[in-house]
C-alpha cells in the first residue's frame, strides 16, 4: 500500500482489492486470496501467516456483510483481532475529501 500517496489512505486497502476486481476482472475470492495467502507466500511467510491455521499468527477483521458477495463490505470493519487482542468497532480518522473523490470510482 502506497501510504505516502495523498490519494491512498492507510485505511483503504479494501479499495485496492475492489479496484482489482472491478477493473481487472478477478473474482472477489481471488482478490482476497492475493491479499492474504498469496501475499504471505511471496513474502516467504506462508508458514507463519496468510491463513487461519493452528500455530499461525492470524490478524483478522470481522465485517457484517460477506466480502465474497461485495468487496465494499470490507469498508465497514466491526471488529479487529490482532496479536490475540480484540478491538471492537475500531475508530479510524477518515479524510472526507479523499473519500468523496475516490467514491466516484466505485
Segments and roles (model prediction):
Residues 100-106:
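A short C-terminal boundary segment appended to hydrolase-like catalytic domains
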Residues 1-63:
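His/Asp/Glu-enriched, well-ordered alpha-helical/loop segment
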Amino acid at each position: 500500500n502506497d501510504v505516502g500517496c495523498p490519494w491512498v489512505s492507510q485505511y483503504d486497502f479494501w479499495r485496492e482489492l475492489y479496484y482489482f476486481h472491478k477493473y481487472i476482472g478477478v473474482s472477489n475470492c481471488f482478490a482476497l486470496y492475493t491479499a492474504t495467502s498469496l501475499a504471505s507466500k511471496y513474502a516467504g511467510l506462508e508458514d507463519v501467516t496468510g491463513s487461519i491455521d493452528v500455530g499461525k499468527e492470524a490478524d483478522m477483521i470481522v465485517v457484517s456483510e460477506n466480502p465474497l458477495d461485495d468487496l465494499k463490505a470490507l469498508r465497514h470493519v466491526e471488529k479487529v483481532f490482532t496479536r490475540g487482542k480484540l478491538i471492537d468497532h475500531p475508530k479510524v480518522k477518515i479524510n472526507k475529501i479523499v473519500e468523496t473523490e475516490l467514491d466516484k470510482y466505485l
